[in-house]
Amino acid sequence: MVSISASGGYAMPCCCESQELQSSDMETPAVGTPEFDRNVPRICGVCGDRATGFHFNAMTCEGCKGFFRRSMKRKAMFTCPFSGDCKITKDNRRHCQACRLKRCVDIGMMKEFILTDEEVQRKREMILKRKEEEALKESLKPKLSEEQQKVINILLEAHHKTFDTTYSDFNKFRPPVRSKFSSSTATHSSSVVSQDFSSEDSNDVFGSDAFGAFPEPMEPQMFSNLDLSEESDESPSMNIELPHLPMLPHLADLVSYSIQKVIGFAKMIPGFRDLTAEDQIALLKSSAIEVIMLRSNQSFTMEDMSWTCGSNDFKYKVSDVTQAGHSMDLLEPLVKFQVGLKKLNLHEEEHVLLMAICILSPDRPGVQDTSLVESIQDRLSDTLQTYIRCRHPPPGSRLLYAKMIQKLADLRSLNEEHSKQYRCLSFQPEHSMQLTPLVLEVFGNEIS
């Protein structure tokens, strides 16, 4: 006969497996045990059942964990009725407690790892306290309200409706013409869809009741003055001598098209339609070029510092924009702005909120109801700040809101430089005649 003692006394027979599963002692890593592969099934070292982890310094199942804990705490002494070398399995582990306890000791289970009742109670209290702290922390964490989430969803939809990532409409512009000195060349499209660009049609393009006439969703024929009609043979721009600024006609069409899309986006901003038509126009005239610069970041590529809008014909480098009349006084800070904005890695939600905040700026010239504009912008700003705290993980979220607001300040400087260069361009008739009525209306008649 072989006796296995746990410091004297007999333990009551194990009446049911469920009692063993109620063990609450601390699970401990095995002393000196090498790392194991978590993908490999873990087997209890005592009975061969599925193990749940290291318990009291050995890999065991919940049943053997509970059996060892009770045996040690009760100082049980078991006697094997056989030869003392019973094979312990999942099915017979309750038949011989002596050999089962011996097996527990043999695989390295140690009573020193067993918690006292007081330690168990303290552990339970610590766990409960930690859960309560986590619940409190979660409850204090800012959350987007239903209204804020609705605003974000509306802005996302507005952006998707007014920003074509295929850039298919670019084929409707007067074709890009790059001089032989440019680093890139472009071929003309076989069929060119052009616009009637006579400056005589510029009257009342942006009239006070123009907003009510804009169809939704946005379509090419948004403005009566900008009818995109197909020409049978060649564009009117092909009948004149190649201008000194060969890219101006194409980029003028691109900017005109972009203004239309900005107007469409603005109309869907919650609260924008609550403003008077005069204030809507004032906001759009002042912010249009800034929002275009913001939106263009989606096509900006840092690898070669270009704007890629589909095919190579519509891949724009700084040299292309200089051939439309702009100087490095604008382009150098513009590229720097694009790089900085790209590095912020904004979520699309943050991007559309920034565009809306840019448009709804109460300090724009000509705005009458500044308090209403400010209240709309404040709601958008609050939504952006809450979104960053809730959805933008660190470290990218650190000071992100402040960095985004700084980008709006940078846009003001770019806007000012663009206006200066536009005025120089528009004072030259041979260049101003290449501009569209909408471009002339938005950038030409400055609000004082």
From Swiss-Prot:
Pfam families: Hormone_recep, zf-C4. Calcitriol binds at S258, R295, S299, H326, H418. Composed of three domains: a modulating N-terminal domain, a DNA-binding domain and a C-terminal ligand-binding domain. The 9aaTAD motif is a transactivation domain present in a large number of yeast and animal transcription factors. Belongs to the nuclear hormone receptor family. NR1 subfamily. The lineage of its organism: Eukaryota, Metazoa, Chordata, Craniata, Vertebrata. InterPro entries: DBD_VDR, NHR-like_dom_sf, Nucl_hrmn_rcpt_lig-bd, Nuclear_hormone_rcpt_NR1, Nuclear_hrmn_rcpt, VitD_rcpt, Znf_hrmn_rcpt, Znf_NHR/GATA. Keywords: Cytoplasm, DNA-binding, Metal-binding, Nucleus, Receptor, Transcription, Transcription regulation, Zinc, Zinc-finger. This is Vitamin D3 receptor. One of its GO terms (molecular function) is vitamin D response element binding. Nuclear receptor for calcitriol, the active form of vitamin D3 which mediates the action of this vitamin on cells. Enters the nucleus upon vitamin D3 binding where it forms heterodimers with the retinoid X receptor/RXR. The VDR-RXR heterodimers bind to specific response elements on DNA and activate the transcription of vitamin D3-responsive target genes. Plays a central role in calcium homeostasis. Also functions as a receptor for the secondary bile acid lithocholic acid (LCA) and its metabolites. Its main location: nucleus. Residues 267-285 are annotated as: Interaction with coactivator LXXLL motif. PANTHER family: NUCLEAR HORMONE RECEPTOR, VITAMIN D3 RECEPTOR. Residues 41-116 bind DNA. Residues 117-146 are annotated as: Hinge. A zinc finger (NR C4-type) spans 44-64, 80-104. A motif (9aaTAD) lies at residues 437-445. It comes from Coturnix japonica. Residues 147-444 form the NR LBD domain. It is found in: Nucleus; Cytoplasm. Zn(2+) 1 binds at C44, C47, C61, C64. Zn(2+) 2 binds at C80, C86, C96, C99. Homodimer in the absence of bound vitamin D3. Heterodimer with RXRA after vitamin D3 binding. GO terms for biological process: cell differentiation; negative regulation of transcription by RNA polymerase II; positive regulation of transcription by RNA polymerase II; vitamin D receptor signaling pathway. GO terms for cellular component: cytoplasm; nucleus.
